[in-house]
Swiss-Prot record:
Belongs to the ATPase alpha/beta chains family. The gene is ATPA. This is ATP synthase subunit alpha, mitochondrial. GO terms for cellular component: mitochondrial inner membrane; proton-transporting ATP synthase complex. GO terms for molecular function: ATP binding.
Length: 25
């Protein structure tokens, strides 16, 4: 299974959204 740069980018974006969500609580 290849891990595409796009998938890595989406994962990073998702993680940053999640961390922002938790810091805003």
């Amino acid at each position: 299974m290849e891990f595409s740069p796009r998938a890595a980018e989406l994962t990073t974006l998702l993680e940053s959204r999640i961390s922002n969500f938790y810091t805003n609580i």
